[in-house]
């Protein structure tokens, strides 16, 4: 049995921090013109300890960072990612390298087609929170990508179409991944809100 004084417990108690949702993007945007400071950093900045805080703040601020001058190797990309998080294993392995050299591609990730706005991992029970894309070698035309702010879309829907927003917060929608030897499925609402109503 332990006996601790009130004074010791009070001294060791951690004060309750002011509420903040570290995952909530602080600057919602609908076009690149709305981003006041475009988040660009160099690989050299990020491998040094001084750049990590700015990197994470930029991710929190607008949801992404464009990293320039990264060595054209998967190893350099992996090393960079492991500076801020662990790499989660999935059906594709721990760290995936994709190319467009398949004979019969059945996924736009393997082609030179532009990838339309979408959400990855909806078929996983624990979808990715942060994803990294690095074009190591480019010898074809096309394959352009675009980024969208899903949180801005959710907030626009909440304001303009509140009934639709509520439906998308409360109805589970199936996400599926179907291949010859793989079938994954998870059900979840399109939007999720926390106890404070934040998406």
Model-derived features with residue positions:
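Hydrophobic, ordered structural segments
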Residues: 1-26
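Active-site environment of non-heme Fe oxygenases that use a 2-His-1-carboxylate facial triad
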Residues: 26-64, 69-199
């Amino acid at each position: 049995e332990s006996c601790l004084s009130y004074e010791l417990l009070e001294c060791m108690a951690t004060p309750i921090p002011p509420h903040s949702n570290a995952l909530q993007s602080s600057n919602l945007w609908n076009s690149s013109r709305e981003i006041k400071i475009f988040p660009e950093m160099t690989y050299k900045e990020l491998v040094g300890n001084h750049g990590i805080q700015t990197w994470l703040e930029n991710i929190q601020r607008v949801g992404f960072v464009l990293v320039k001058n990264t060595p054209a190797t998967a190893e350099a990309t992996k090393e960079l990612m492991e500076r801020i998080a662990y790499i989660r294993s999935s059906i594709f392995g721990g760290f995936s390298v994709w190319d467009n050299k398949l004979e019969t591609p059945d996924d736009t990730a393997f082609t030179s087609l532009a990838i339309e706005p979408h959400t990855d991992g909806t078929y996983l029970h624990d979808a990715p929170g942060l994803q990294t894309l690095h074009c190591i070698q480019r010898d074809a035309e096309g394959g352009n990508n675009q980024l969208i702010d899903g949180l801005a879309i959710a907030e626009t829907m909440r304001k303009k179409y509140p009934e639709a927003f509520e439906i998308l917060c409360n109805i589970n929608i199936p996400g599926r991944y179907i291949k010859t030897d793989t079938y994954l499925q998870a059900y979840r609402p399109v939007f999720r809100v926390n106890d404070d109503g934040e998406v």
